[in-house]
Amino acid sequence: VLDKMQEEMANGYFERLIQTTLLDNTHAAVITLAPEPGLGDRKDEALKEELATYKASLSDEEVAALVEQTQQLLERQTTPDKEEDLAKLPKLSIEDIDREVKPLPLTVEASEGKPTFLHYEDFTAGISYVKYYFDLSGVKTEDIPVVAFLTEVLGEVGTANFTDEALSTEIDFYTGGIGTNATVITESVADNLYYPKFTVSGKALSEYQPQLLSLIEEVVHRSNLDDVEKIKELLLNVKADLEMNFNYGSHVAALRRLESYYYEGAKYLQSLEGIDYYDFICDVVAGFDEDPQAFIDRLKAVLETILTTDQLVATFVGSKEDFDHFKQVSEDFFKHLGNHKVEKQAFTNPVEVLNEGFKTAQEINYVAKGYNQTLLGVPVNGMNLFLKSVLGLDYLWNTVRVQGGAYGGMSVITDKGDVAGLSYRDPNIVETLERYDGQVEYLENFNLSEAEFEKNLIGTFSTIDRPLSAAQKGAVAFTRYFTHLTQEKVQQFRDEILAVTPEKVRAYAPTMKAIMDQNAFVVIGNDTKIENHKDIFKNIRNLTK
């Protein structure tokens, strides 16, 4: 069969196959899924009536039997597993954990008035990983979401020398991909130290470095931003993608919104990828047809502001020989960039605890509550990551997921001091917020068995010591460079994790209480349930437009 297909391929076999079986096939169905506002609520009411009717048909003995079954289930949910059963599970011992942090050595080459080069040397099988970090400090607050949209445009539109299809083919032929992104690198929440960056990255076999950088230059310098129809298409696609991401990742949207209540860097990030960015895209879509050129001119002006060699950092993962070649090839790329100084702009969107409820047509909720401990004067300690493990896998798992019926209950605790509870596909709102507050009592009475304590301590290292590729190690090393994180500090953090004791965990309870007492929370979820609890919110709105 394969030989026959090979022979017929040159004679239009696949073209005829597509024409016959797909394009000219009359056996097809078009199915439309149309949302109906209020349908979920009506179904809920119908179910309540059905259950009430069913209950009325039962005898007292049958009702009592159902109550007894429910009580047995609740008891099972709240009863810890037996020690002898847990002991049957295979496990590591704390002695299996490495005490020393493996270094990630970085070569830094900096010269006054020139871009800085960073090199993480590792075996990459002849692949060069490159990334350019452009400083976004010179972008005005109102133009920050324009930067985010530029990352959606560059690489998707045609250029001076290629159509969009030809550009995609050229990139696929010579490289492993070229991408642009905008992000915020955080050093300290308490000190409000963060670094917004626009990045252009790519990877290619080392012999194709010149083609890789030539294509990067083509994308950032020669993209056709005057294609009105393509820009409009991308705007609509971005709006649809954001709405889809909200639908499947509302817990992430809720967490990022919560962080923006107390940290300027997170507020900045809202304009790059969060709800603020979505609102911006909606506004642009609504007014685009009236004056498309005004928005296109704005895209061009912001891109020109970004593309300068001032404060530029070029990173590379690969061999020393390939790094030297990368530096040479980069010089040609730098010649096409501006050399204007980055004039730092003040960020004018103030942080504020808004306690928002975002209404959706979903039947479930995503509930986030928390704050940053460094803003309360409590420095970050390695124990924070242990707390994430024990709170997420023990307390929140049992209370929010098992007892509360949520699909997920998570503890989000970062090395920057963020501490939050987060639920996923949760039938509750107020009950979940109360369970987050219950973390205080859990910590006050923290008393795991020695085996359970050690299991959670070992589990803490599952994220810290996960295997990393050469490119991922390089990314970690580059982030440490930007945030001035030393090897000594990383080692100290690890030592603090290994030094955790139950007494130290219990001593954290007052900090958790102070965090929960800030009463900062976000809910994305069912419109009726949010309205039923409207008194707890400062602001309520529909999530999407």
Positions of the model-derived regions?
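His/Glu-based metal-binding/catalytic segments typifying zinc-dependent metallopeptidases
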Residues: 57-155, 304, 311, 315, ...
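Short amphipathic alpha-helices in soluble, non-transmembrane regions
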Residues: 214-216, 327-333, 435-437, 536-537
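In a subset of proteins, long, contiguous C-terminal domains/tails are tracked
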Residues: 166, 499-545
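Generic recognition of flexible, low-complexity loop/linker segments
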Residues: 2-5, 16-21, 105-106, 116-121, ...
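Short acidic, glycine/serine/threonine-rich loops at helix termini
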Residues: 44, 243, 247, 326-328, ...
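Ordered core of a single globular domain
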Residues: 1-70, 283-338
